[in-house]
Amino acid sequence: MPVKRQSKVYYESDSDDDDDEFKELATLRKPISNRDNPLSLQFEIPASVQSVIHKIEESHIFRAKEEVIWRLTEIMSNVELIMTRYNIDSMSPGRKGSSSESQKKKRKAFLEKIATVMTNVDLRERTLSKILSWLEEWNLILSEVSAINMDDYYHWTVKMELIPDTLKRISKNVDSLIQMALLLVEEKKRAKKRILARGTLWKAWKDRAIKRPATAQALRLDQMIFDQIGLNAKVSEIQGMLQELIGTAMFSKLENTAIKYMSTTVINLSKALNTVSDELKLARALGVTLTPEQYKEDRISLTPLQAQVLGITLNLQQAKALGITLTPEQVKAQRVNLIPQQYQVHGTTLTTQQAEAQRTNLTPEQAKALGLPLIPPKPITFTREQTQALGITPTHQPITLTSEQVQALGITPTHQPITLTPEQAQALALILTTEQVKTQRINLSPDQTQALGITPTPQPITFTPEQTQALGITPTPQLITLTPEQAKALANTLTAEQVSLSPQQAEALGITPTPQPTTLTPEQAQALGITPTPQPITLTPEQVQALGITPNRESITLSPEQAQALGITPTPQPTTLTPEQTQALGITPTPQPITLTPEQAQALGITPTPQPITLTPEQTQALGITPTPQPITLTPEQAQALGITPTPQPITLTPEQTQALGITPTPQPITLTPEQAQALGITPTPQPITLTPEQAQALGITPTPQPITLTPEQAQALGITPTPQPITLTPEQTQALGITPTPQPITLTPEQAQALGITPTPQPITLTPEQVQALGITPTPQPITLTPEQAQALGITPTPQPITLTPEQAQALGITPTPQPITLTPEQTQALGITPTPQPITLTPEQAQALGITPTPQPITLTPELVQALGITPTPQPITLTPEQAQALGITPTPQPTTLSPEQAQALGITPTPQPITLTPEQAQALGITPTPQPTTLSPEQAQALGISLIPKQQEISLSPEQAQALGLTLTPQQAQVQKIYLTPQQAQALGITVSPEQAKAKGISLTPEEAHSLGIILTVEQAKAKRINLTPQQAQDLGLTLTPEQAQDLGISLIPKQEISFSPLQAQAMGLTLTPQQAQVQKIYLTPQQAQALGITVSPEQAKGISLTPEEAHSLGIILTVEQAKAQRINLTPQQAQDLGLTLTPEQAQDLGISLIPKQQEISFSPLQAQAMGLTLTPQQAQVQKIYLTPQQAQALGITVSPEQAKGISLTPEEAHSLGIILTVEQAKAQRINLTPQQAQDLGITLTPEQAQDLGISLIPKQQEISFSPLQAQAMGLTLTPQQAQVQKIYLTPQQAQALGITVSPEQAKGISLTPEEAHSLGIALTVEQAKAQRINLTPQQAQDLGLTLTPEQAQDLGIASTLKQAEAVGIIPTPTPEPYQERRLSLTSEQVQALRTSFPTKETLSLGIYLTPKQAQYLGITLTASQAKVMKICLTPEQAQALGITVTPKQAKARRTSLTPEQAQALGVILTPEQAQAHRITVTPEQAQALGIALTPEQAHALGIALTPEQAQAQDKPWTPTPVSSTREAKMIVSPTDQHPEDGYVVDVEAQRKNLVTLNQAAQTSALPAQYLTIAKNLIIELLHIDTVRLGYLSRKYVAYRLIQLARNHLTKRVKTIQNTGKGYEVQSLYTMLDRIDQYQKKVMHSWTDKQKQLEQRRKQCLRSMTQFFSQLERGYKLSLSQPMPSIPSFKKIPGFTKLQRPVLELLIDDSKRSDLFKTLGQASVEAVWNADLSTSSYPIIEKAPMSALWAQLGGYPDIPKLLQLDIQSTFRKSLASIRSQSKKIRK
């Protein structure tokens, strides 16, 4: 067995060590030899086995070497990367980040490669180890054989060698069977399709025939003639039915052809009938019968149908004599074969389709035998040498000279006609002649030519070699063409058509053939580097229309006289010279080829080659020839009619496509093989035989040398100067070059092209054989073509099959192939604006060039020989073959395939076998692959480390099958076989299985406290600590966890007063407590103070020391909380809590406990003796302490008088000092840092100097600046002074005190006092303008008027009074007129106006309204300014203050400042509120308030404002009210007016809005618009409210669950009682009744406890809501922070408007009134006390009004929400609950 490497880390092992290692492995793998094992028998290992072992060992060594080399390469690359990294870091520090990222990517790729290599190595080692183990076992088995028969051994060896071949043959046979089976299955599928297709055949016609049998009847004869519409409908229907037959694939191609024949015949019959009907109508309209002679005499032209209707039978001569024009259909009907000239003579117009229709080719002999007329022979073209050889004098062709050449030769050119465009002709008002119109060269479509009466010349059809090969046409090789006259002159017997001579015949006759130029295909030209000259492209009208090209209108030709008369200067045209002029000027003309007419050819004795004869489809049908269906080419019009989007080129359809589309193809010409022609009796024309040069040389035939075409480069290399050819430019090219062309293409000479900077494309040079021989060029031998006679003379038997030439042979023979079409992808066609069909669009090179498309050069594939010949060194690429490819190529692959990385495979273009690829999440994300989420299994530790909370579904309880059966579980057979059964905690709870803490701990179940409590699991402290569960004190209490302070600290519980008292189990038993087995085993038992109080356990002071209790709990438990306990537990006590607990604190203790020492926390100290002397009863604890502290209130209640010395150490509020009779001195206020308001200082009798007021932080406003008197003056005035006042130098009195004492304030004293207008008025002080100016009081005009101040404009300006013109006029101030219309006026106030301004204004409330006063005005009015208000320089007034001042508040001001006005405030202020303003300002208006404010509300506005209208109010509205559904939750809730609101009513909390509030608060904190402490308070309020809502829903659910569980047990007992009563066993009933009584008591106790919890939670919620409402309102006023506040909730049932008419009658509940008790009726009238006041939130889905299920619920306003159902009395049955609801509904209706 192979030895695996122990380490995969040390990759740096040397190759020698690896070689030694693998040599040792090889020795270990060798079988035990005979020397080592002398007991083994003599046995010879087969050579094949030895070779396999040898190859395995060699491959192993080879792979080991490769691995070592690869590792060394990786090490070197890593070293280079490290070096480059440090170089990069030292050279450019800025690129450090990118380099590190690249290093990370490379490192990741390197690690992935290592992982791939290791997996592959492991697989290889496993495979090799299996093979080697198999070989070793085989060797041992063979070595154990005792005796071997060598003959049998060799026999079986041969058989084993044959086994692979046998297996291969079996595999091939299996493959063939699979193919046969597939063919059979496909055949069955086809048969099935045929059966199915037959069932769906003619479905529409069958249905119509069943429903309306009359429509399935055939037309009558008269209907066919006169009803054209019906006839066309029937014909289209029959054609569609036939097309369905073709599309079913039930018929063969020949049968489909027959069906098409029937369809075509039906269509032709319909057309014929239509024509007959038209002619009948014409004959009836004429009503005149003429004889043929009359028609001839009157020269009346009749159609054949008209003649047939009149009974006249005409032939062609008669029709011509009578002037009757025959249509092509009529000519075909008479079986007349007309040539284009005959068509023109008869006036018949051929369409383009008719001209291009392919026809059957017959030889002249066949046509003569069939009696068919022959087309006259075509003219024959000769070259100059042929005409010289034949002695023919050619007619000299005219030579075209340019204007420069004419001018250079001094020739006076004849005036040429001038060409004008149609627009120019129209602008010059020329009347064109018929010849000028014809010479405009306008391209017309066939329809336009037919409409204009123009007969087009039929164009010949050109086929490419590929098309001829596809059509089976044998092209005639390049021969010499003679006219019949020339053939006759040469005395050769030829047919009536043109004659083709082979090169040998031409040489024998003395005719030298013209050398043919060689034509290259575009691919060959591209391969040779030749750029072809772009040729102009001609488009058909359909192509132009499809491409959206606007054709240029052709120009008009004018004669020189017309041009001169119009004053037009013609452009100089090239001059044409006659041969005589050229000879006179010494110009040598270029020889032109000579064209001979058939007569000239016949005169010269030349016999033309017979041409094939074209048969019409009727002739081929008459001869019984079946044409092969050819692909059909559709014109754009036909394609558009069939619903096909045509491409610019005609669309080529296969026969299958034409069958599928129901198109009848035009009969195509038929090509017959010699056998078919012989079978039909047709003698084919013998074809010439083509010989290769070798065959010709073998037969002794000397071929005529062919001319050679040289490229310009070759010609330049041989020193031949080619004749420069003229360049032809298209109009577009001339326009691009700035040349003004005539409408025709311009021909430039080489000199002109060179002058314009145009580089002409070099043209190939054609050399004659003589020139080739003179230049010493060896021409390529061309194949020789022999005529049948020459072949017969030489003894060569031609093959009767048609001869097919390859493109190379055609090129060698001088045949010019058509350039290959270009295929465009849909993207390219879309970019060019071409609408493609789903298939790629094929364009010819000319079309592609016209559209500006450059064809993509295709890659050239070179063979190794060509690569070597061209001197190209190919890059050696590693080739990877799959085992199948290697086996197909016969290559024996190495047992391990070579692994390529994806990049290498992509670079080599290899498509990898689709193996599953494993990607890391980063790779998947980089590739944009979304991985399928796989379930991940985590251990509890991993989940804890990842921060995942394991829910009970992920951690289950395991039971053995025996345990499950013992518990009464029914197991499935699969569960019974497994070792363990896993249950979730919920499943265990549902099955009644109790999960012990040990199971919960052992199984690692992470449960939330609520889940543990619901499952009945007692969560131990160790579990909570191990699972890192953070418990709140409430959760710990609910779960029954008793924690020590240390355990609580470990669990992260902040020790709040819900920590418990510890007892040992013995102490607990002594107290009478019943312990569980688990509690009996623990060392200590922990009880909460509440549990201890419920059990009647008295907590000792020592036990209380270790407990953190709230003051309320300590007070309720009777525990005296000491200062040390409060300090040790870090309890922050409020003064009220310290007072309630009886804690007496010194200032130091208060400071240590974090209590702010305000007067309620600093008390009066007494020693125990003093306290006993005062008659105080002391507790033992108080008797032990040194001092007893009493609050001032306690001292006052006990009747203890506080001396001034004791009062000095007490921080009292002014009210407390006043109530205790303590005179608070200024020093006490200063020492205690008490900020006193002026009112408090006055109440306490403290007189302050301005300096003292400044030290105490009192802002000296007019109420604090008082009148000073000396003690003597005060005694003289009759004032009684206290001893403290007698000692001071001055006594200060406020103006009010002075007024109360009857002291008159002199004006001098009043000058130093800052008084408000009200104070001055009450004191009897007349406020002068100087005082107002000295005090810097800014008065409004109204205040000045109320104070009775008469102000001049200057005084008003000094006082800062700014008023508008209207205000001045209202107050009575006459303003000084100024030019500025908007300038502020100066006002004068009277004493009455000043007196009316007696109002004090709180500043914070005025901020919401936006009524601003300047600081001077505020100081004058007695308003206290804060520092921030003084900075803003504006003061805000509340609506009440504005009303008292007579200031009118506009609705805009109220809207701009978001003032929330009550209806009373709005009415008092005179603000008229619209319903929109009321809704925008969140003002809730009752109907009475709306009526008092004069607001007319529509029902929609009332619904939006939360006003519930009565039916009478709703009917009083002008517009009928219809309730509309509301989308939002807040609008769906009906808001109750404040008058209907009760203090105990709740609020609706919008959860989403509160979450948005949190976001808003965070944003405000980021912008520093809100202080941190306010942010914390607001967040805590929101979080607490949301938590309370969640908890109370949980309370409700648990309460209901507990109730249902108790009811289930009670129902079970009730059933047992009924069952026992039937049996008569009374003693059992008594025990059951006892159990029922206990259950009822227990139910009351449980329900009472839950109700108490709900009440406590509801109190917390109401307190939180009130705090939130007040705090949010303060934030909105103070910081302009708009937060969503809780809304008042709806009453117990939804209030909806009463309906005047009900859609359905009210269904009474099925309750007998006689069975109801009077007590129940009286109780039913009262409102149902809700178990739960369910306030809806966003989390509970609101029930929007919809169609009610019953009239009762409709009367109640729809079904209530789920918590409403739980409000029903839980003690009553469901019928009783419904009865109470019904009584409530009656109350609502009343």
Curated annotation (Swiss-Prot):
InterPro entries (UniProt xref): FAM186A_B_C (IPR049146), FAM186A_B_N (IPR049144), FAM186A_PQQAQ (IPR049147)
Any Pfam family the entry gives: FAM186A_PQQAQ
Residues making up the signal peptide according to the UniProt record: none
Organism superkingdom: Eukaryota
Family: Belongs to the FAM186 family.
Name used for this protein in its record: Protein FAM186A
Species assigned in the record: Mus musculus (Mouse)
Organism ancestry: Eukaryota, Metazoa, Chordata, Craniata, Vertebrata
Gene name for this UniProt entry: FAM186A
